[in-house]
């Protein structure tokens, strides 16, 4: 005999524990709200409904198989309401999190199409509910199935109002999120019925079996309840995305309260796609297109962050990518590229002139001088105005100017200056975005954390330069190795694209000097990761350790590889270990450093 508590101990709780482990690195405060809200609603509505069902003897249990009974329902059944909700919502979150919800909000959809898609299913759900209500006569064969339909269909109709079109646009993920938990729970149900833990009355059901020991009504129950939970999860994700895109930029400097957050979510739930600003979403889409085309690795790697952090990091990186492309576009003359960068500087100054309120920028002044997709990225970038500091943005532009003017890196100070411009600035901006996107970061340590982020950016750039000595020489005729590290002949060879003629031993010596400096910087900088919001720590640690592993690869290599890198499998291993906590802290170069020694960064 299988007790109801054993059903939980052997089946539902282990699966829930596995899902919780898999999802833990991605858990955010938004998820906490989703779990609490959906579990509360599920428990509050399912409890009276299930008592009604058991009272009318549609469902029964083995008295010896339960721990206690509250009302007409076993304690374990109340547990099941919560466990089932957690299993389905967690699995749905794991399935859905890899793509931003904003990609499926489309204000350009024709109104007539939206009206049809929105209201025809609602009418269908409510019609089914009304007919089911009329058919739910106690002690009749349709009773149990009809009770399931009138319990579920009005909720489906309500949820369809706020997320119907959204779910149709990502129907594969929705169906998968419904199917897998349904199959698992039906299997558990079938197993328990076959062993007498509970049973379904033949008098109040159709008697149709989907599988042996699995009545049609039980299959219908799990299918429809899982559908409700997936619909609710999607509706919550869509509402959070709308609030983050349209409300959050206006409230960065306001104290958040739970009742205002709930009000905004209700407002967002009721918004049709057409009621939202199409330009805002099209600008975000244009920004992400830039990233998909220019940096598939960032596009993929960003998925380890929360929706909110990923959206804003994407906006930041899209701006960096667009400005970098402007500076590097060899189809445009250097004087014209300098003019474009001056336009960008003017935009940045305008953006930060008025610290609060919507930025008053005349975008027509950039048309014709800057590609439209880049202007869209700039418009999206304005949402970060209250998060970033102008100094870091201007510092990034100084780095582009350094490259455009082909300035020589004369000494270590120049190397640090250039690296700070193009990388420390980005590290600072990323940290400010992460701290603003999610509660839980240590804001009292913000200044120190930002300084360590700048150190980390510097370390990553030094690793980048160390890796690309030959590549930069061949492809750009450029060297970022300090001139005073080289002889006149070595400097000339690097500029002539003949870096290989320095020999493996010399290239390795130069590269490792930067790698060891980066390693020393990493040692302190990596400690600041623990001051970031919890949901961001694993992603940042993974990104940093992937780059650190490149330095380790250079250290271990025999000679100097043309471009040291990690294989896709190696990157996946590093990321998995960092995300799931198998690797923490500094993972740098181990062993004797030989002749190459780190230089001092002031």
Curated annotation (Swiss-Prot):
Enzyme Commission code: 5.5.1.19, 2.5.1.32
Topology versus the membrane: Multi-pass membrane protein
Catalytic activity line of the entry: all-trans-lycopene = gamma-carotene; gamma-carotene = all-trans-beta-carotene; 2 (2E,6E,10E)-geranylgeranyl diphosphate = 15-cis-phytoene + 2 diphosphate
One GO-annotated biological process of the protein: carotene biosynthetic process
PROSITE patterns: SQUALEN_PHYTOEN_SYN_2 (PS01045)
UniProt region (Phytoene synthase), positions on chain: 245-602
Membrane spanning stretches: 7-27, 35-55, 69-89, 110-130, 142-162, 173-193, 211-231
Pfam families, sorted: SQS_PSY
Pathway linked to the protein: Carotenoid biosynthesis; beta-carotene biosynthesis; Carotenoid biosynthesis; phytoene biosynthesis; all-trans-phytoene from geranylgeranyl diphosphate: step 1/1
UniProt region (Lycopene beta-cyclase), positions on chain: 1-238
GO cellular component labels: membrane
InterPro entries on file: Isoprenoid_synthase_dom_sf (IPR008949), Lycopene_cyclase_dom (IPR017825), Squ/phyt_synthse (IPR002060), Squalene/phytoene_synthase_CS (IPR019845), Trans_IPPS_bact-type (IPR044843), Trans_IPPS_HH (IPR033904)
Outcome after substituting residue 77 to K: In carR23; abolishes lycopene cyclase activity, rich in lycopene and insensitive to retinol
Molecular function terms, GO-annotated: 15-cis-phytoene synthase activity; geranylgeranyl diphosphate synthase activity; intramolecular lyase activity; lycopene beta cyclase activity; squalene synthase [NAD(P)H] activity
Location in or out of the cell: Membrane
Keywords: Carotenoid biosynthesis, Isomerase, Membrane, Multifunctional enzyme, Transferase, Transmembrane, Transmembrane helix
Family (UniProt): In the N-terminal section; belongs to the lycopene beta-cyclase family.
Function in brief: Bifunctional enzyme that catalyzes the reactions from geranylgeranyl diphosphate to phytoene (phytoene synthase) and lycopene to beta-carotene via the intermediate gamma-carotene (lycopene cyclase).
UniProt xrefs under PANTHER family: BIFUNCTIONAL LYCOPENE CYCLASE/PHYTOENE SYNTHASE
Stated name of the protein: Bifunctional lycopene cyclase/phytoene synthase
């Amino acid at each position: 005999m299988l007790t109801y508590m054993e059903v939980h101990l052997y089946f539902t709780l282990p699966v829930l524990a596995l899902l919780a482990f898999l999802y833990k690195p991605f858990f955010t405060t938004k998820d906490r709200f989703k779990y609490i809200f959906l579990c509360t609603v599920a428990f509050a509505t399912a409890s009276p409904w299930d008592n009604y069902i058991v009272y009318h003897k549609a469902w029964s249990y083995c008295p010896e198989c339960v721990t206690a009974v509250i009302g007409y329902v076993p304690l374990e059944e109340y547990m099941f309401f919560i466990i089932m909700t957690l299993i389905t919502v967690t699995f749905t979150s794991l399935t859905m999190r890899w793509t931003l919800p904003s990609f499926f909000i489309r204000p350009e959809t024709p109104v007539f199409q939206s009206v049809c898609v929105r209201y025809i299913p609602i009418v269908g759900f409510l019609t089914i509910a009304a007919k089911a209500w009329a058919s739910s006569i106690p002690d009749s064969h349709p009773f149990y199935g009809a009770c399931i339909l009138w319990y579920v269909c009005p909720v489906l109709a309500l949820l369809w109002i706020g997320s119907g079109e959204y779910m149709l646009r990502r129907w594969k993920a929705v169906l998968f999120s419904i199917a897998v938990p349904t199959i698992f729970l039906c299997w558990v149900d079938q197993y328990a019925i076959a062993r007498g833990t509970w049973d379904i009355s033949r008098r109040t059901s159709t008697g149709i079996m989907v599988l042996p020991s699995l009545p049609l009504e039980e299959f219908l129950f799990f299918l429809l309840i899982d559908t409700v939970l997936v619909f609710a999860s999607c509706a919550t994700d869509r509402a959070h995305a709308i609030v983050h895109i349209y409300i959050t930029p206006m409230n960065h400097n306001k104290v958040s309260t739970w009742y205002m957050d709930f009000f905004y979510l209700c407002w967002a739930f009721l918004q049709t796609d057409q009621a939202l600003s199409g330009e805002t979403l099209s600008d975000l889409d244009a920004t992400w297109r830039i990233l998909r085309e220019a940096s598939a690795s960032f596009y993929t790697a960003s998925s380890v962050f929360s929706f909110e952090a990923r959206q804003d990091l994407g906006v930041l990186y899209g701006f960096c990518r667009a400005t970098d492309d402007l500076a590097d576009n060899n189809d445009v003359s250097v004087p014209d590229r300098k003019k474009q960068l001056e336009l960008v500087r003017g935009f940045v100054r305008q953006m930060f002139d008025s610290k609060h309120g919507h930025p008053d920028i005349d975008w027509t002044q950039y048309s014709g001088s800057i590609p439209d997709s880049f202007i869209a990225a700039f418009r999206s970038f304005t949402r970060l105005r209250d998060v970033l500091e102008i100094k870091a943005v201007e510092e990034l532009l100084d780095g582009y100017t350094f490259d455009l003017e082909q300035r020589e890196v004369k000494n270590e100070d120049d190397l640090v200056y250039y690296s700070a411009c193009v990388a420390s600035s980005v590290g600072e901006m990323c940290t400010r975005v992460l701290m603003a996107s999610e509660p839980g970061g240590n804001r009292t340590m913000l200044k120190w954390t930002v300084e360590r982020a700048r150190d980390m950016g510097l370390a990553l750039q030094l690793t980048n330069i160390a890796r690309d000595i030959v590549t930069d020489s061949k492809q750009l005729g450029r060297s970022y190795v300090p001139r005073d590290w080289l002889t006149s002949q070595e400097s000339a060879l690097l500029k002539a694209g003949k870096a290989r003629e320095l020999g493996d031993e010399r290239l390795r010596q130069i590269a490792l000097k930067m790698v060891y400096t980066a390693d020393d910087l990493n040692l302190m900088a990596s400690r600041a990761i623990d001051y970031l919001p919890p949901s961001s720590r694993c992603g940042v640690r993974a990104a940093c350790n992937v780059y650190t592993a490149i330095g380790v690869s250079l250290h271990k290599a025999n000679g100097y590889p043309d471009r040291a890198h990690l294989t896709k499998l190696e990157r996946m291993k590093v990321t998995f270990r960092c995300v799931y906590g198998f690797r923490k802290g500094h993972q740098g170069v181990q062993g004797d450093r030989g002749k190459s020694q780190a230089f001092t960064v002031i």
